[in-house]
Each structure stands twice: as C-alpha cells, then as structure tokens.
Amino acid sequence: MPAPRAREQPRVPGERQPLLPRGARGPRRWRRAAGAAVLLVEMLERAAFFGVTANLVLYLNSTNFNWTGEQATRAALVFLGASYLLAPVGGWLADVYLGRYRAVALSLLLYLAASGLLPATAFPDGRSSFCGEMPASPLGPACPSAGCPRSSPSPYCAPVLYAGLLLLGLAASSVRSNLTSFGADQVMDLGRDATRRFFNWFYWSINLGAVLSLLVVAFIQQNISFLLGYSIPVGCVGLAFFIFLFATPVFITKPPMGSQVSSMLKLALQNCCPQLWQRHSARDRQCARVLADERSPQPGASPQEDIANFQVLVKILPVMVTLVPYWMVYFQMQSTYVLQGLHLHIPNIFPANPANISVALRAQGSSYTIPEAWLLLANVVVVLILVPLKDRLIDPLLLRCKLLPSALQKMALGMFFGFTSVIVAGVLEMERLHYIHHNETVSQQIGEVLYNAAPLSIWWQIPQYLLIGISEIFASIPGLEFAYSEAPRSMQGAIMGIFFCLSGVGSLLGSSLVALLSLPGGWLHCPKDFGNINNCRMDLYFFLLAGIQAVTALLFVWIAGRYERASQGPASHSRFSRDRG
C-alpha cells in the first residue's frame, strides 16, 4: 500500500501528462503502449547503429577509400568511443535546456542527417562531391629493403568521414543517454517490477536490432552494395523518428530540471586544490563553505545534498574507472576481431564449386561469401538466450540458495571472460600467422578487395565472440545495474552518463594503443602489406590487452571488496536513506 502512494506525488512543474482515457485499465494500457514505442525506437536505432559499425572497417579498407587496416580499425574505434564518450553531453543538454523528449527527437534528426553521409560516399559521384578525387596512387614507391622506414599513405577523405562519424557518435550517444531514462519514465507509475521488466526488454530490443542488422544489412554490404547496405540504416533512423513523433500523445514528458555538474566541479576543486578554491571564493566565504550554486531560489538540490551526492560519486567512480580496460577488450569485437576475420578463410554460401575457391566463385557470380560481421551474432545470440534464462531461472535459483553474487562480483567474473576472449584471439592469431609465414594462403575476394588469408576457417573465431558475449552479461548489465542502483535519484542521469562515457574512454584508449603500435617498429606497423595484417603481430597486441585486463581485474577486486565492506559497515544506513526512486 505505501508504494502506490509514493508514486502519486505531485508532478514536476511543467510536466506534460499524456491524453489518456480515464478508467481503471486505460492508464496501464497506454503506459505499456508508451513503453513499447520506446522499445521499438530503440530496436530501430540499434539496427542502424550496428548497420554502420558492423562493416565499417571493411568499408574503409575497400577500394572506395583504400585505407589501411590499421587506419580503418582506428576510425572504427574512434566512432565507437565517441558514441559512448559523448553521452554526458546529450544528458547535460537534456537536463539543462531541452528535456529528455526534445533531446531524443533532436538527436534522431541529427542521427538521420549524419548517417546519410555513408551512403552518399558509397558511389563515385557522391564521393567526389564530398571528398574530391582520390589520389592516383595511395601507395608510395616500394622500399628497397625490408627494414626501410615508410609511413602509411594519408587516408583519403579522412576529414569528412571523421567529422561525419563524430556527429553520428554524438547523435547515438545522446539517444543512448536519454532514451533509456525517458522510457523508464513511461512505466514508472506501474511499479518497480514494471521498471525492472522494462530494462530487461530494453536490453533485448538492443540485441534484437543488432540481430536484424547483422543478418540483413551486413550481408548486403559485403555481397551486394555498400550503397544499399548503408541506405538501410538511414531508413531505420527515419522510421524510428516517425514512430517517436507518432507516439507523442501517449508519452509523459518532463521539463529540464537543471544539472549538478557545476556543483560537482566546485566540490572537486575544493577537495583537490583547497588553496586555489579559497582564493577563488575569497569574496564570499559563506558561499565557499556551503558550496551553493548561483541559482535563483527554485527547486533543486540543497548544498548539503550536493555534498552527499559528491561523496557518493567519489565512492562509485573508482569502481567504474577500473572497468575501462574491460571496455578496451569489449570493443575489439567490432574492430580488430573483424580485421582478423577478413584474413581467415570465409566460406561461400551455396557454393557451386566443390573446391570452394572464393575468387573463382565470385567471378562466376555463383555464390555469396558469408559476411564476416555475422560472427557478431555469436555474441548477440548468447545475450538473447542467456539474459532471459538468467533472469527467470538462474538468478531466482541462486537467490533461494542465498548464493546470488552481487553486481560487483558479477562484474569481476565478466572481466575474467573478457580476458579469456582476447587470449583465445591471440592464440588463433598465432596459428594464423604460422600458416602465413609458411606461405599457406588462400586468396579471397570480399566486396571489391582481394585478401591473402590463412586456410583456417573463420568459424575458429566463434569461441572468442562467445566469450565476449558471456562477459557482456556479467560485466555490462551488472555495471548498468550498479550505476543506476547506487546513485541517488538526483544523480542517476549524471552517473549513467559517466558510465557510458567511461565505456567510450575504453574504446578511445584501444584506438590510441593501435595508433601507438602502428608507429615504425611497432607490432602493427606493416605498410608494405597494404590493406592486410599478414606482416603485423596482432597476436602480441591481443596478449598485451589480456595483460592489461588481468592487472586491472585484480585492482577491481580490491576496490570492489573495499566498497562492499564500506557498504556493510556503520555508514550503510546512509546508503539506504538516499532517495533512489
């Protein structure tokens, strides 16, 4: 009985309620309709996102742009990083100026415009309009000796593509940071169980969109046309925008409530640099003591609440920061794992020739090659199967036996599976290079590019994709749970934004590591092997990632242990006194 009363609190000034029929069942039915609309929008947006990322390395590495494998991998990691790193920007704009509804709508519009760049550059006239003419020869003169230094060719159309990918990353990150909370607002009145189920289905929608995109869009991009393949994500975003606008009458929309970013920065400055803070605030000692914002008297957090929220942030941040190396590992499946797969033997679908030689069959037009991006389905299918199984069967059983691990313990287990994934990838790369160095190769044409691949089947990559999928269940989902549940209500949006931002930091650090190792003398420096990785040492790169993950996993276990002991101590009563909604 008390819970329903708590949810009937006065509405926020400026909050718009949907035009719902009055009645016992009407509101519940329309709340579910609003939640379903959000799930459909998220599914279409994720289908578009994976449609962009699945073959981005292949697209940039193709004859359309002639980027090297290292350059294409770096661009993919930058885009993935931006799509997470910029999440606080969208959340801040929604909190301060736009509100979540308008932030999502405007983000989808930007998404639609930015995603149009990829199909626009997928045909010659469009490329020449945006990028100019490609240089006659992207390769320099041959090296007289194997050890002579030579830099990789400057990537064609890089400024335009990077600008478009960064705008696309900003749009995707803004949708990610606002649509999740906006959807939860729609079902919050139905109770806490409805909110929990919404998040389960929300994660399902993400992966369902990924499945549809990888099955259809990735196949079209690799075997038919990049123009058609990249036009489908544009259509998905357009349909998502239409559905979002069409469902407006059933949405609950809330006005912007302000941001606590300035308060947190002031508190950080006071704690880290007290002398500097005292000089800065000497004109107002009382302001320096209570850290009050220069706000007019309006609803918002009090100075005491700001201090309490800052203390929570200081406790949570070390836990989330130690997840960054996990994200470095996680994003390999959409960058270096793809590049590795392009240099393994990719079988044909419905081959007409028993010899199954890819180049000959492609020349005859008698079959299609299996899209390398389909291996991402191993990750997605694991999530689609194990999430409901874990939610409905495994977790309740462990709970009855009092063996259910905490979110932090699950995250540590997820790091272990991520570690094993890159170890498996490194071992496979060692075996692949063994065949390459003994001149045991097969030539295969993928899209318009000819690759010298090892005779190892691409199916050998399935274990590393399965392991990264299992790690996602134990690290990513509990990470979201931890960030949402440990934050006070007034900072849930900010802390979720920080969580996604740190995910992007992991991707960008992975990109920086690739760039560093691509310098002359680095493991990934192989300019004489244009477009390929056969003279690189990507196996050592994978083992380096595994070592970084192992060290930080041990650090995470220590930090998480301290956090849980502090939560169970005398101060734990304050944890439960915070308003988590």
From Swiss-Prot:
Keywords, in A-Z order: Endosome, Glycoprotein, Immunity, Innate immunity, Lysosome, Membrane, Peptide transport, Protein transport, Symport, Transmembrane, Transmembrane helix, Transport
Short name of any one Pfam family annotated for the protein: PTR2
Record flagged with keyword Membrane: yes
Topology class, membrane: Multi-pass membrane protein
pH dependence text: Optimum pH is 5.5.
Superkingdom per UniProt: Eukaryota
Glycosylation sites: N61, N66, N178, N223, N356, N439
InterPro entries: MFS_trans_sf, POT_fam
An MF annotation (GO) of this entry: peptidoglycan transmembrane transporter activity
GO cellular component: endosome membrane; intracellular membrane-bounded organelle; lysosomal membrane
Places the protein is found: Lysosome membrane; Endosome membrane
Record's catalysed reaction(s): glycylglycylglycine(out) + n H(+)(out) = glycylglycylglycine(in) + n H(+)(in); carnosine(out) + n H(+)(out) = carnosine(in) + n H(+)(in); L-histidine(out) + n H(+)(out) = L-histidine(in) + n H(+)(in); N-acetyl-D-muramoyl-L-alanyl-D-isoglutamine(out) + n H(+)(out) = N-acetyl-D-muramoyl-L-alanyl-D-isoglutamine(in) + n H(+)(in)
Membrane-spanning segments: 38-58, 76-96, 103-123, 155-175, 200-220, 232-252, 310-330, 369-389, 411-431, 458-478, 497-517, 540-560
GO biological process: dipeptide import across plasma membrane; innate immune response; monoatomic ion transport; peptidoglycan transport; positive regulation of nucleotide-binding oligomerization domain containing 2 signaling pathway; protein transport
Basic and acidic residues bias spans: 1-14
Family the UniProt entry places it in: Belongs to the major facilitator superfamily. Proton-dependent oligopeptide transporter (POT/PTR) (TC 2.A.17) family.
Record's protein name: Solute carrier family 15 member 3
Organism: Homo sapiens
Encoding gene (name): SLC15A3
